[in-house]
């Protein structure tokens, strides 16, 4: 299967989105389609053997819209060599696209208002008692009034011709949209007004001057058509302006990419170049206050780097030779050089932007209701409008009243509010997540996370740091009460033994020795004893490091219960012997992260059951569990890496949604099996296989924050869907005149157009509230 993203043009409402979806879904070989009205894009999963991107574009064209594949290439070939492009710097900003659209709408709106003011004044002045020139009030000049209104309407229709073009085109294709509602409503008003002008001409020709004036007052709807078009444009303008704010997070990420960089040549000369021209392997210099242009590894120098833009972590991270740095992070203090490793679309920044945009291109399950309604909404509205006209004609015999209600039904109906409810909230929610260092790979993951009832935490690297460290150094005491050796001597002995070992415990001990400036001595006859430890000879001395079994074999007596005491504290003891005598013990533990206990408490407050899964034995696992306030029943111990997926499946079979949190190193199958997989502490490696959500920081608190953000986003979507359905459920009957017998009031099409415009604006404005979302557990 292949997946491609397409730009789709011409979509204006949820009905358009539904028609494009339906047209592409019908193609053989298309597996799934996700059309995003807000972004004007479409993601398609398809079988290349059965259908091509050209076939997909043709299907969209036949439906009355335009489509083109979005190029995902990251390299441009020039003069026979690949030149890396800056993925982030050259991504088209969705915000700027929307701002350009809003600017064009603003021009249309200004022109519309300039001509609408005199049109409305002339057309409604006689009803509202406004003073009018005699040329418009004298019975002999009724045609002057009608012609003036018609002339003033022409520019309004001209600048808003898109509603008519798109609307009637959708009718021709048998897939009417919101533009069709506006076009038919405005056209009906204009057509009836033109018909009234012919009646007036006949009346004037036969000397019925008074009747002609009455016809002009009662049957001209030019100002109604002009007001409808202008108010819809007001709503579209405000809506587009609001939508441009929803992409603020992506816009901010794109703006982080610097445009230039300083390249250091082999002879030491420095040259400022365009970031586009940087190639992997080049050496660059970054000075204090500058943004790092690409990903790389520090060569010389040291500094504190602000990585908050990528991870949400506000505390600068110290960087020295050998450390990695990422594009768009900011150098705060010292100057350093680094070698570029990933450039253009391969940088962590570009991948984050792409991931957020891809998430916005997907569809949340909650959107299915809106899609189903939108698919039949416009045809149903046309039927209701026709029935309204017929009923009013039958009851009153008045074309004016029948036309007023029928047009009001058309223009008050708003499928846009339904279509915008989900994508706007998803865009703001995923953008907010990116600001917090929480990356959702799909809208479905964002929705599913809110329903998670159980969170399974892989112990190593999630609850703990994932890097064992020395916790205790205990020198053995001889029978006479004297120490077997000094602490420094014990560490020298440990360094000599462990320097050749590849065991994780050995790495922790060597790190401790290096930190204390202890240099490992050379040993002879080094041997690893499987399942026990290591032995070696240092001069005439036989030395060993290992567990109780190895000590017993060496004749070194370990105090009864000492190993169990360390295990009960979640520590792994390593015993050291010299010539058959126990000389000391060094305990190593994978330390619990500072925020783990608080994060688990926060998850409990959210009503989530927490389980810890580990390959450690139960004694060690329960010792860790006690430190984070988990009970023994919440611990799943002695689990082989291959069995993690099975345990997740068993929890799912027991009922409820399950989320799995791991570092993605040996738990990818479990992450994929879970209803939502969260990869934690990935840093720049955001493309973890199997993970639905990527947590940039190694902070378990982000799991609780992600759940809170998910719940807030879906709550916002439900609010928008409710109000969109409620608005149409009340507005359409009101426009049809259902409440006329009770109120004696008939809704004007002008008020209907205003209400329709405001409904979409309200939906977008409500979604924008997510930009101020703050989890109960504040981000550091």
Regions found by a protein language model. Name each.
Residues 1-146, 156, 243, 269-272, ...:
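Flexible metal-binding regulatory segments at protein termini and peripheral loops
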Residues 28-46, 50, 220-222, 251-346, ...:
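Conserved cytosolic catalytic loops of P-type ATPases
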Residues 73, 200, 204, 209-211, ...:
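Juxtamembrane coupling segments of multi-pass membrane pumps/enzymes
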Residues 281, 288, 362, 480-483, ...:
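Conserved ATP-binding TGD loop and adjacent catalytic N/P-domain core of P-type ATPases
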Residues 107, 329, 453-502, 510, ...:
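ATP-driven catalytic headpiece of P-type ATPases
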Residues 91-114, 166-189, 353-385, 402, ...:
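Soluble-to-membrane junctions at the N-terminal ends of transmembrane alpha-helices
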Residues 128-143, 172, 176, 191, ...:
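Membrane-embedded alpha-helical bundles of multi-pass transporters
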């Amino acid at each position: 299967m292949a997946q491609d993203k397409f730009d789709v043009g011409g979509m204006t409402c949820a009905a358009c989105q539904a028609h494009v979806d339906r047209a592409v879904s019908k193609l053989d070989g298309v597996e799934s389609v996700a059309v995003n009205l807000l972004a004007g894009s479409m993601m398609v999963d398809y079988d290349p053997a059965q259908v091509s991107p050209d076939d997909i574009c043709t299907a969209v064209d036949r439906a009355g819209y335009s489509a083109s594949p979005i190029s995902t290439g990251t390299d441009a070939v020039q003069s026979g060599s690949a030149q890396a492009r800056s993925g982030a710097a050259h991504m088209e900003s969705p915000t700027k696209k929307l701002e350009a659209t809003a600017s064009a709408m603003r021009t249309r709106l200004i022109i519309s208002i300039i001509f609408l003011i005199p049109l409305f004044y002339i057309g409604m002045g006689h009803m509202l008692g406004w003073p009018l020139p005699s040329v418009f009030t004298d019975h002999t000049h009724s045609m002057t009034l009608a012609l003036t209104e018609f002339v003033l309407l022409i520019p309004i229709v001209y600048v808003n011709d898109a509603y008519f073009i798109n609307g009637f085109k959708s009718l021709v294709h048998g897939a009417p949209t919101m533009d069709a509602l506006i076009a038919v409503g405005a056209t009906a008003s204009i057509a009836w007004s033109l018909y009234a002008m012919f009646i007036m001409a006949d009346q004037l020709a036969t000397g019925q001057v008074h009747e002609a004036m009455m016809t002009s007052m009662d049957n001209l709807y030019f100002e109604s058509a002009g007001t409808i078009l202008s108010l819809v444009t007001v709503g579209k303008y405000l809506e587009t302006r609001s939508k441009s704010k929803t992409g603020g997070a992506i816009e901010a990420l794109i703006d982080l990419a610097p445009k230039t960089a300083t390249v250091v040549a082999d002879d030491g000369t420095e040259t400022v170049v365009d970031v586009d021209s940087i190639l992997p392997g080049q050496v660059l210099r970054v000075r204090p206050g500058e943004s790092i242009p690409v990903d790389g590894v520090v060569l010389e120098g040291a500094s504190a780097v602000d990585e908050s833009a990528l991870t949400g972590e506000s505390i600068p991270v110290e960087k020295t030779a050998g450390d990695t740095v990422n594009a768009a992070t900011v150098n705060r203090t010292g100057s350093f050089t680094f070698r570029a490793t990933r450039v253009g679309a391969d940088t962590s920044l570009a991948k984050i932007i792409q991931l957020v945009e891809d998430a916005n291109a997907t569809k949340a399950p909650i959107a299915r209701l809106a899609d189903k309604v939108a698919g039949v909404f416009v045809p149903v509205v046309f039927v209701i409008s026709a029935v309204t006209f017929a009923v009013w004609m039958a009851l009153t015999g008045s074309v004016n009243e029948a036309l007023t209600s029928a047009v009001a039904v058309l223009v008050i109906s708003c499928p846009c509010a339904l279509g915008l409810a989900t994508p706007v909230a998803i865009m703001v929610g995923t953008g907010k997540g990116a600001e917090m260092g929480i990356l959702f790979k799909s809208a479905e993951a964002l929705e599913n996370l809110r329903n998670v009832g159980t969170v399974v935490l892989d112990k190593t690297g999630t609850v703990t740091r994932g890097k064992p460290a020395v916790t205790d150094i205990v020198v053995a005491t001889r029978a006479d009460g004297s120490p077997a050796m000094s602490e420094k001597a014990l560490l020298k002995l440990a360094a000599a033994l462990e320097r050749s070992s590849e065991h994780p415990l050995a790495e922790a001990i060597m790190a401790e020795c290096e930190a204390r400036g202890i240099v490992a001595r050379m040993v002879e006859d080094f041997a690893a004893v499987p399942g026990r430890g290591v032995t070696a000879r240092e001069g005439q001395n036989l030395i060993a490091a290992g567990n109780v079994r190895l000590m017993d074999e060496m004749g070194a007596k370990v105090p009864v219960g000492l190993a169990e005491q360390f295990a009960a504290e979640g520590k792994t003891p390593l015993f050291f012997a010299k010539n058959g005598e126990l000389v000391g013990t060094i305990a190593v533990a994978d330390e619990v992260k500072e925020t783990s206990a608080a994060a688990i408490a926060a998850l409990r407050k959210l009503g989530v059951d927490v389980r810890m899964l580990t390959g450690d034995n139960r004694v060690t696992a329960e010792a860790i569990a006690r430190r984070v306030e988990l009970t023994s029943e919440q611990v799943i111990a002695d689990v082989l890496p291959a069995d993690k997926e099975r345990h997740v499946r068993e929890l799912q079979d027991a009922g409820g949604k399950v989320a799995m949190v791991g570092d993605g190193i040996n738990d990818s199958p479990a992450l994929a099996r879970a209803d939502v997989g969260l990869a934690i502490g990935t840093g720049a490696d955001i493309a973890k296989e199997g993970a639905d959500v990527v947590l940039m920081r190694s902070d378990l608190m982000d799991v609780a924050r992600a759940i809170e953000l998910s719940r807030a986003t879906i709550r916002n979507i439900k609010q928008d869907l409710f109000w969109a359905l409620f608005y149409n459920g009340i507005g359409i009957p009101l426009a049809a005149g259902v409440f006329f017998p009770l109120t004696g009031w008939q809704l004007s099409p002008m008020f209907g157009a205003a209400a329709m415009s405001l409904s979409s604006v309200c939906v977008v404005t409500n979604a924008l509230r997510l930009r101020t979302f703050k989890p109960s557990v504040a981000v550091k």
